[in-house]
């Protein structure tokens, strides 16, 4: 685990990504999260295991390119994001949608 996130693992995970593809992956016990773009795989694994009390068996990460945005005549870039697909051990799950 890198020193950057050692004391604050909750800052690694930004939010779960709920898309059509990510929802299909839930059946395979794979969860998709948006994470800090500086986070390494050991940071992500430690954060998921500590926050959700589950066993992680694998992580795939991707850094999609930044997209350009325009506001009138001003051009800019969106913030850098990193996606992580986390595979959990059999029998483990994360409750993304609270039951009422």
UniProtKB/Swiss-Prot annotation:
One of the early assembly proteins it binds 23S rRNA. One of the proteins that surrounds the polypeptide exit tunnel on the outside of the ribosome. Forms the main docking site for trigger factor binding to the ribosome. One of its GO terms (biological process) is translation. Belongs to the universal ribosomal protein uL23 family. Part of the 50S ribosomal subunit. Contacts protein L29, and trigger factor when it is bound to the ribosome. It comes from the Bacteria. Pfam families: Ribosomal_L23 (PF00276). The lineage of its organism: Bacteria, Bacillati, Cyanobacteriota, Cyanophyceae, Synechococcales. PROSITE patterns: RIBOSOMAL_L23. InterPro entries: Nucleotide-bd_a/b_plait_sf (IPR012677), Ribosomal_uL23-like (IPR013025), Ribosomal_uL23/eL15/eS24_sf (IPR012678), Ribosomal_uL23_CS (IPR001014). GO terms for cellular component: ribonucleoprotein complex; ribosome. Keywords: Ribonucleoprotein, Ribosomal protein, RNA-binding, rRNA-binding. One of its GO terms (molecular function) is structural constituent of ribosome. It comes from Synechococcus sp. (strain CC9902). This is Large ribosomal subunit protein uL23. The keyword Endoplasmic reticulum does not apply.
């Amino acid at each position: 685990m890198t020193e950057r996130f050692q004391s604050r693992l909750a800052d690694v995970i930004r939010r779960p990504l709920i898309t059509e593809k990510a929802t299909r992956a839930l059946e395979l016990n794979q969860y998709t999260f948006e994470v800090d773009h500086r986070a390494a795989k050991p940071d992500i694994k430690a954060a998921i295991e500590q926050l959700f009390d589950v066993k992680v068996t694998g992580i795939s990460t991707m850094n999609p390119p930044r997209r350009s945005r325009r506001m009138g005549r001003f051009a800019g870039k969106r913030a850098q994001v990193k996606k992580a697909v986390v595979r959990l051990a059999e029998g483990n799950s994360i409750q993304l949608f609270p039951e009422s």
